[in-house]
Curated annotation (Swiss-Prot):
GO BP annotations, alphabetical order: diaminopimelate biosynthetic process; lysine biosynthetic process via diaminopimelate
Gene: dapB
Name this polypeptide is given: 4-hydroxy-tetrahydrodipicolinate reductase
The organism of origin for this protein: Bacillus mycoides (strain KBAB4) (Bacillus weihenstephanensis)
Similarity remark: Belongs to the DapB family.
NCBIfam families: dapB
Binding site for (S)-2,3,4,5-tetrahydrodipicolinate: H156, G165, T166
Catalytic residues as annotated in Swiss-Prot or TrEMBL: H155 (proton donor/acceptor), K159 (proton donor)
Length: 266
């Protein structure tokens, strides 16, 4: 397979570290640079615990793109930084794979239009775990037969956004197969505000944040005399790397924006 030159934004994060290891063990991936505002001017190999890769680190993406030739930007930073990075990447005609969440519908619409105009491949993935993507697809299928559904997403206590991008994407897919319905008693009240979670077209999303968790989600469907639960668990960040690899390889052949890994797997 042809070599793919990759820039990683956020190499010191837990996802970023796994992505660096992915670069090292994948023959056709070449890590040509990284973005880390604290370690500009150093190399990946200078960072504690990192493999012996000589990829230079830049403090900002602007400077990096001026000096480095790359095929794909892999962004694993924060929602705020990720939005800035994908906007710049599209402007510069650089393909990107974005693993941060928190994009609004309006932001996604604008990015989709910009990517289409520039004909630049872009993938925004709320979740890179193949199992999580299948969970979302199975939930979408089940929604045709079960109108009553609630989502419980559980993540580590350092996650910044709630509900998770995976939960939001799951609800979006369920809504495509489900007639809008308010669940529970029509006169239901909350004795404590927020007790029933976020409400999207009658679908309640509950967010749990605890140390010891990584990324987990349950989609619970209820029917007469029965329940169906679709669950996925990621026990470490290595679970996301198969999706990262697939996304980097796939974005090379795209000329538009794709939101969600479910749109690039068969």
């Amino acid at each position: 397979m042809k070599e793919i030159k990759v820039i990683i934004a956020g190499p010191r994060g837990r996802m970023g570290y796994e992505a660096v290891l992915l670069m090292e063990r994948t023959a056709h991936f070449n890590l040509v640079a990284a973005i880390d505002y604290k370690h500009g001017g150093e190399k990946i190999s200078d960072l504690p615990g990192m493999p012996a890769l000589d990829a230079p680190i830049y403090a900002d993406l602007h400077t990096c793109l001026d000096e480095v030739e790359a095929d794909v930007l892999l962004d694993l930073t924060t929602p705020e930084i990720g939005k800035k990075h994908v906007t710049l990447a599209v402007e510069r005609g650089l393909r990107s794979v974005i693993g941060t969440t928190g994009f609004t519908e309006e932001e996604l619409k604008q990015l989709t239009e910009n990517a289409k105009e520039k004909e630049v491949g872009t993938i925004i993935a709320p979740n890179f775990a193949i199992g999580a993507v299948l969970m979302m697809k199975f939930s979408q299928m089940a929604a045709k037969y079960f109108q009553d559904v609630e989502v419980i997403e559980l993540h580590h206590d350092q996650k910044l956004d709630a509900p998770s991008g995976t939960a939001v994407k799951t609800v979006e897919l369920i809504r495509q197969n489900r007639v809008p319905k308010e669940q529970g008693h029509p006169n239901e009240t909350e004795q404590l505000e927020g007790a029933r979670g976020a409400n999207v077209d009658g679908i309640h999303i509950h967010s749990v944040r605890l140390p010891g968790l990584i990324a987990h989600q349950e989609v619970m469907f209820g029917g007469d005399g029965q329940m169906l639960t679709v669950r996925h668990d990621s026990f470490n960040r290595a679970s996301f790397m198969s999706g990262v690899k697939l996304s980097i390889e796939t974005v090379m052949n795209l000329d538009h924006l794709v939101y969600g890994l479910e749109n690039i797997i068969d």
